[in-house]
């Protein structure tokens, strides 16, 4: 999932500035809220008779309240909203990147801020298109939409607890006052990057929350208040939209560079080896 790739990006630039505990901390918290979102998506698909296109959903909060609340929890953690797990782990990564005081560290910091804005926007785009606004589903599918049975909801509830509390409960051990005792000799720290991160300027600490709220409000305007705006916006940047919508044409490029040559090579070996030598 591309969202997971972006969160792995946070972990890797934490490693790049030497904030190894912060990277592992985010790996742990991310496991809870991303698994919650994955299973929440499966819950929606199950309740919508295998429909997977958000453009064919909407208004499902009235039909799937438990799933909706759980996915809100996962999204709040992913966006780094205070008290949720992602707030503690993602923010210490951004603060560590800033505290590195290197060119690459500052580049990572601002790239992480941009990613935080986009993360909040696309997360609430998902929530608004799926659970809020008017429904775009056909009458039969919408009327029969439902939360899954308890046996499917139970794992989501466990993950939701982790998405809410794991960051707060673990922060002192992973990146706080008990960090040295917790890690022991497991991680070699060459400098005090985590300690420096805790003394980052106030604007550095506040900025991730500001951009997260901005992304949420942007999605609210675009998909609830002014649902016609996305189409107008897309029409104005059609070439860029086509490029991004097709994932930078990465699949097509991969097919041409890797898949097709592999098939050609395989056929060649089959004809010259198996066909000509073994069977011939």
Can you name each region flagged by the protein language model?
Residues 1-54:
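Alpha-helical multi-pass transmembrane bundles of energy-transducing inner-membrane proteins
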Residues 1-6, 48-84, 106-115, 140-165, ...:
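Interfacial and helix-entry/exit segments of alpha-helical transmembrane bundles
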Residues 5, 30, 57, 86, ...:
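Divalent metal-coordination and catalytic microenvironments
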Residues 12-15, 91-109:
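Interfacial segments of multi-pass membrane proteins
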Residues 34, 38, 106-144, 180, ...:
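Predominantly late transmembrane helices and immediately cytosolic-facing juxtamembrane segments
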Residues 38-41, 50, 81, 90-91, ...:
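Alpha-helical transmembrane segments of polytopic integral membrane proteins
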Residues 81-94, 98, 168-190:
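Membrane-helix interface motif
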Residues 172-210, 221-280:
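Aromatic-capped, Gly/Pro-kinked transmembrane alpha-helices
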